[in-house]
Amino acid sequence: MNILKCPRIAGLLATALLGGNAWAGGCSPIVIDLGNDGIHLGEAGVGVYFDVNADGVRDHVQWVRRGGDEGFLALDRSGNGIVDDGAELFGVGTPLILEGRSAPNGFVGLAQYDSRQLGGNDDGLITDADAIWPQLRMWVDLDADGVSTLQEMRTLGSLGITALETIPKLRKYFDEAGNVIPYWAWAMQRARPGRVLMVDVFFRQLPKFSGT
């Protein structure tokens, strides 16, 4: 068994990587480098209000850059065509269906759909051989406002993505804005170079203001 596919162990690793508290680095979704030019996030201190951990409260967090080519891996659970909250991304807000709790990180949330109980084939990849594949989407928040629209949603096929790794590599990387990227893997593409980076970003939390 790969230890990173075990939610309990993955949660303990997240705690260690993020300095003793899994929430210390903020709230996480999986982000994919669609432009294959590296992961470029927003400026320090510039954020949005978005309910990343799906608890009904909008979090003030740093975000992706405006006009960038980074995309959020998404699953439209509500069927309304857009992303409502972190339960429809892959991160700490992702429900672990067979366990009745939230995932410790995005890759654990994604890996559950590779299990045979949820229509997968347990090969370490999410592909069109897994039942979840047709439901996956990419949210490219072009205006970086934290509000999903129909125009910002893409299918994986339209982006040439053919497979998503579910077992990440470990690292502890802080970008210049203070976001933490403890996990990374590859998303496979038909076009060259054949794969692009996918990371679980723990966005830095920002101060909340009254009235939000």
PLM segments and residue spans:
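N-terminal signal peptide c-region/cleavage motif recognized by signal peptidases
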Residues: 19-21
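Calcium-binding acidic motifs and repeat modules
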Residues: 13, 25-212
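Bacterial N-terminal signal peptides that target proteins for export
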Residues: 2-11
